[in-house]
Amino acid sequence: MTGAEEWKLSMGLEDTVPARLHEHGEASWTAERSHVCSIRQANDSAGALPVAGKPEPMARSLASAPVSPWHHMDRGSTTPAKARSHSASYHCPSSSQICVPGVGSPSAGYGDVPGASGHRPNLLSWPPALSRKESFLILTAHNRLRSRVHPPAANMQRMDWSESLAQLAEARAALCVTSVTPNLASTPGHNSHVGWNVQLMPMGSASFVEVVNLWFAEGLQYRHGDAECAHNATCAHYTQLVWATSSQLGCGRQPCFVDQEAMEAFVCAYSPGGNWDINGKTVAPYKKGTWCSLCTARVSGCFKAWDHAGGLCEVPRNPCRMSCRNLGHLNISTCRCHCQPGYTGRYCQVRCSVQCVHGQFRKEECSCICDVGYGGAQCATKVGFPFHTCDLRIDGDCFMVSPEADTYYGAKMKCQGKGGVLAQIESQKVQDILAFYLGRLETTNEVTDSDFETKNFWIGLTYKAAKDSFRWTTGEHQSFTSFAFGQPDNQGFGNCVEMQASAAFNWNDQRCKTRNRYICQFAQKHYSRWEPGP
């Protein structure tokens, strides 16, 4: 690149943002516009972010913070982002994150940069895969930065490296000039909820850790109290990096040419992914509070390294302090008893007939699961679908939050009477969105029933004696869990599960006679077949 060349970065939006790059000697770039920030700026910004216990005025740092033109992009969009360089187009491989041709000073970690003196670099001599040391440094950087968020996070989890996610990231980085996403379904242990951070940089201009610092520097523009990014800025890389419930990380780097310019694609994959929004409002990436104060039961330990500002939730070394009765088997990884037939309860200490007209009888639940279009205790009542009462939709399913309170089985019957079931939360995505929504309801919504006892909400999970485990109302096994720290703990008496307001709406086992509000769910397969009422 000689002289001054203009890059026009179009992301398929109405606005096109110019950024003029100049070469000042070998392998040194600067930018005239604040839309593209240097790696040195990013590192300085990351270091300038307030640390818990050392708050700094956010306004002081905003002037030097990186600003990006892609703040209007929908984080949940499936439309591939596009970028243009020298009037030639290429497709970034990210759909939910932004692929940015950034600029910066050369990284000392790379030594002599191929192509720095102006000749075309040999990509075959460039190491494409991350070494074990680089992977360790990237993971360490993520955990260190996650421990430095401000305000401090009460539920931030420690991340572990995933080779399967790293392979996904390598594959996506290799597709530098295409919008095709790797097949997530072929990756063992990961569902489709995978988050992405993608960055395209001039070759040799940055190490991977510096790119991670660049993403974290976007936090200067993020207002956690409003769950919003500053005007004319993007924070999508930052919010995914510090998404509290993302616990698995894998990254990849690949060299490539973009319009004859040597570039590097930096990609990180996160599971479970984040950056969800609800009714156009983005969900906050973590819960504010004292470090590790809202860890779930699965990650009840608190990890803090020497260079961490705060603690991160992790799996404790000795998670179980219990035993199972009546020949029950204790699963150490889940801290749950698997009971012999005929026994149930948390410790297998508890030793149920209903005629179902239009439905199936579930022995574990001692109740009916109604066919589509029918409700009531015996599934004998034909019901119409209440389309107008959906409070929110998640992945096609309808969720209704009750204004009144009832016992668990009273709530179950009321949902069933409308043709639905108590909510089944089977992924981190649904948990995050519901917790965010209920948190806003807590201060804005009025309860019509004045005798409710708590601000908690029943979901369709109960402890089944015959199965010696928690099961959903439909009888399905509970594969996803979000129990609060120290829960479940009611020793067989709290067999029903609620979303607990005081624990950031993580789960708590509760006595089924407690009066709570509740959440009804109508699956897409149900209302797509529903017969309209008269």
Swiss-Prot record:
GO CC field: extracellular region
S-S bridge residues: C324-C337, C339-C348, C415-C520, C496-C512
The C-type lectin domain, residue ranges: 394-521
Leader sequence segment: none
Cellular compartments annotated: Secreted
Segments of this protein annotated with the region Disordered: 47-88
InterPro entries listed in its UniProt record: C-type_lectin-like, C-type_lectin-like/link_sf, C-type_lectin_CS, CAP_dom, CAP_sf, CRISP-related, CTDL_fold, EGF-like_dom
Protein name per Swiss-Prot or TrEMBL: C-type lectin domain family 18 member A
EGF-like domain: residues covered: 316-349
Pfam family, one: Lectin_C
Keywords noted in UniProt: Disulfide bond, EGF-like domain, Lectin, Receptor, Secreted
Main location: secreted
PANTHER family from the UniProt entry: CYSTEINE-RICH SECRETORY PROTEIN-RELATED
Domain SCP: 139-270
Keyword check for Disulfide bond: yes
Superkingdom of the organism of origin: Eukaryota
GO molecular function: carbohydrate binding
